Amino acid sequence: MSQENSSQFLRNRPKILLIIFFSALCVKLLIFFLATDPIVFHKYPYFAQRISEGFDIGERILDLSPLYLYINLFIYKIYGKNWEVLAVLQIFLGSLNCLLIYFIGEKILGRAVGLIAAFVLLLYGNLTVVELTLEPESFVLLFNSLLVLILIQNQAETAPTKNSWRWLLAGVVIGLAAITKANALLLLPVALVWVWQKHPSPARAIKAMLLVTAGTVLLISPITIRNYVKFQDFILLTADSGKVFFHGNGPGSTGMERADLPDQGFAEESQSEPDYAHVLFRKAARALTGRHLKPSECARFWFGYTLDYMRAHPLSAFILEVKKFFYFWGNYEVHDIDSAYKNYRTLQTWPLLPFGIISALGIVGLGLALKQFRQAFLLYAMILVYLFSALVLFVASRYRLPAAPFLAIFAACTVTSLYTQLRERRRIRLLACAGLVAALFAGTHLFFRSEIETLDRWQRATRIHYSLGGNMLFKKGLYREAIPEFAKAIELEPGFAPAYNGLGMSYAVLNDFEQAEKNFRRVIELSPGIDQGYLNLGLLYELKGEPSKALPLLEKASRLNPGNPKTKEHLQKIRAGGEK
């Protein structure tokens, strides 16, 4: 396309908007139909269905995004269990967000930057993977972009009578983002700084700041009141902040791989509720203190516990933060949802943009746009907010994702700069800029490579071969087919106890008692503090007609997990048989 034709195209705004939206929608629908498995992570749908059926989910409501839970409830009321409707809605919102990023880029750095940024974002395949997980990130990204657009528009309107309501609207959007994902509250100080520096008079600035704050409080306060009325506990939004802080900074955290309670995954598996770790953390806090802590006190306990650990290991804590900083810009995507990780691996074979190229181009763009810092302040601030959030918590893909749309704008800034240098034949600057991008791109792949490979091996073992492989096949009754999947998980991670447990149960159902016993004993060896190994080995002995061997194992399982009804049932059965 010649320069004249490209200029003419850039002037045709309606055509640009249609091309962006439908290109994004087509790419996302192709990923939805061709590269993703059926939805298997149903945390929000599960609780929405429970509430709809009249059940009180108790403290679990404090573990969930308030707005997203109610969106799920609304979808369930209309469409029932057809959760694909919500997935399609989220990729529609993702396509709409590409348009918003175009508008933001256009207003701040020019139409060409906006257009390229929109295409960078729609070709970032991992974004669509996250949009399809039935988690609230799609709505967070949408609210973030709306907030930036509103703030930019308010800057353009100087008449106080025209834009007072817009400051209130900005606060409402911050509130919507916060009741979707609590760390979005960090956007409030960003908005207040923007208001202060852009207003010509202190009096008008203070009025606008009060309106922004009022809009935010208007959305947050109903959730806070709900929490206090229901639990007699002051909880602003959710009660999982201490748990998440422990994940990112506690013993065993690597920056990408989170710290967990001992045998947490194993303990979660025996529960019917999804994402049961929240309950386990509250139980652990109450057990360690010997008091029935309120949910907010449990969160404070884990904050205190983690801070004590960090103070006791200051050098390790510092190194961890350095790692998190580099991981934030790295190419590798850390997924904490099984299906998302599998879909991410599938998309690696597609001709889409990895985060590494967006990161490398974006970092260079951050430098190139410094001369327009005041104008682009909000873009810098949005990236810094989520960098700070990742440093405080951990660098899972979902946690850094809200920075990606704004990083895409800076990436587009680099692309337009490279094009200008090429067109004007500034070879030295072109080579220097391109060389820097290439070096940064290589860095996003090479930093801490061995740790990334270790984590990816763990992800393949636990998520693909265990959760989505052997475990799912076992639940379908395909026991013989499940065995090689469990075995593959063990081959990749020999210390992963749940895979031995799955193998043992599969062999037991297939009447290979010798192999079943061998695997259950390995479970006990690896996870002596969890009841599953003792329970299953006890049940195996009971099945073999050896109640004297089963009894001590079931008693041990009962001591470890007194509330397990299956253990109680079989203990009573064996004891009743012994009394006859």
Each model region followed by its residue ranges:
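Transmembrane-helix motifs of polytopic, lipid-linked glycan transferases
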Residues: 88-109, 146, 150, 360-367
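Transmembrane-helix signature of polytopic, membrane-embedded enzymes
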Residues: 14-15, 96-123, 141-142, 164, ...
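Membrane-interface anchor segments at the N-terminal boundary of transmembrane helices
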Residues: 84-85, 291, 301-302, 308-379
